[in-house]
Amino acid sequence: MLSTQVRPLRADAKRNRELLLKVAVHAFSHKGPDVTLESIASEAGVGIGTLYRHFPTREALIEAAYRNELARLCAGVPELLRTMPADVALRTWMDRFIDYLATKRGMADALRMVIASGGNPHAQSRERLLEAVGSLLKAGADQGALRRDIDPADVMIGISGVSLAAGAPQQREQAGRLLDLLLDGLRYRPPDRRRRRAAQT
């Protein structure tokens, strides 16, 4: 019986794949969906045959590049929580989410090409993002830094709003200030005793 297991990529093949995805994201974001695959392969330092071995079609490369950005964003959460307080980890992740949204906008035409061909590059992306945000919020609440009544979807909408209002590269300083304001609204604050007593009388 033939094995159906997928063999892990060799180190050099894995490195080539990661290089191709990195170059592809930049190319599709800045040059549009019609950038030649030959130019992507050349910039990654591999032959066109290597590109096609990993990604048989243009659409496959676009979808893989987009999904790789999403995976990197979500997979980085445990390391952030391991190396810094949860509220700082959330603020750092917010910056990364802004970068991810900028990449997504830059790849909009390329992603539409994938969708037109029957693909669904956005499948399960919302669920993965909600899970990532939820992990950060829970850790923050457990550490006493963040409120427990926060819906991860509300945080995602808030960051997306910042990206829409100040998502241009020259607006990053303003975007940072807006994200600071958003995080401030998520912080846990002990009830004011005097206000609580007044409410009880």
Residue ranges of each PLM-predicted region?
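Short alpha-helical scaffolding segments that buttress acidic/His motifs in well-ordered protein cores
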Residues: L61, M94-F97, I159, L182
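C-terminal peripheral helix-coil segments that are non-catalytic and often amphipathic
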Residues: M1-Q5, D99, E127, E131, ...
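Short hydrophobic/aromatic patch on the recognition helix
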Residues: G45-F55
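Hydrophobic alpha-helical connector segments
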Residues: A64, A75-T103, P121
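Short secondary-structure transition hinges
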Residues: T92, I98-S135, G161-A168
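Amphipathic, non-transmembrane alpha-helical scaffold segments
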Residues: A13, Y66, L70, H122-L130
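Basic, helix-initiating cap at the start of DNA-binding domains
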Residues: M1-E43, A60-E63
